[in-house]
């Protein structure tokens, strides 16, 4: 403890540093699309109902995406959310949603120039 600080002030500084470290760790590792599996970034343009949505993908195409059953109730998706989609091999105009980014994660990806210019709406 430094001589010019009281015990309470010293504890406050430690708490603030711990909160800062927790915020950094909460971003931790941001999941990126696996290009080998054909995954890509996309922005949700329109909710169509029945677990279907219209997604603007990084390759410039708008695809009809579906939310798989394992994600349906756990992860709520809204318009203008950043998602990872995987186009179907036999119908490339359709895709499955693999992951949804939070607003914090999306802005982090945008700030670090990890998003393609086509879908970077978080500038």
Swiss-Prot record:
Top-level taxon of origin: Archaea
Disulfide feature: none
CDD domains: S1_IF1A
Sample GO molecular function, one term: RNA binding
Composition bias type Acidic residues, residue spans: 1-11
Stretches assigned to the S1-like domain: 28-102
Disordered, as annotated region: 1-26
Record keywords: Initiation factor, Protein biosynthesis
Pfam families to which the protein is assigned, alphabetical: eIF-1a
Record flagged with keyword GTP-binding: no
Protein biosynthesis recorded as keyword: yes
PROSITE patterns: IF1A, S1_IF1_TYPE
Record InterPro entries: NA-bd_OB-fold, RNA-binding_domain_S1_IF1, TIF_eIF-1A, TIF_eIF-1A_CS
Protein purpose: Seems to be required for maximal rate of protein biosynthesis. Enhances ribosome dissociation into subunits and stabilizes the binding of the initiator Met-tRNA(I) to 40 S ribosomal subunits.
Protein family according to the UniProt entry: Belongs to the eIF-1A family.
NCBIfam families: eIF-1A, PRK04012.1-3, PRK04012.1-5
Protein name: Translation initiation factor 1A
Species this chain originates from: Thermoplasma volcanium (strain ATCC 51530 / DSM 4299 / JCM 9571 / NBRC 15438 / GSS1)
Upper taxonomic lineage: Archaea, Methanobacteriati, Thermoplasmatota, Thermoplasmata, Thermoplasmatales
């Amino acid at each position: 403890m430094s001589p010019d600080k009281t015990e309470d002030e010293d504890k406050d500084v430690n708490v603030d540093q711990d909160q800062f470290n927790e915020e950094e760790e909460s971003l931790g590792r941001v999941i990126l699309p696996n290009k080998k599996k054909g995954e890509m970034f996309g922005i949700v343009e329109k909710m169509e109902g029945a677990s279907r949505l219209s997604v603007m993908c990084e390759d410039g195409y708008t695809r009809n995406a579906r939310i798989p059953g394992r994600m349906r109730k756990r992860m709520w998706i809204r318009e203008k959310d950043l998602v990872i989609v995987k186009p179907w091999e036999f119908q490339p105009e359709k895709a499955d949603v693999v992951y949804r980014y939070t607003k914090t994660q999306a802005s982090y990806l945008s700030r670090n120039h990890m998003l393609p210019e086509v879908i970077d709406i978080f500038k």
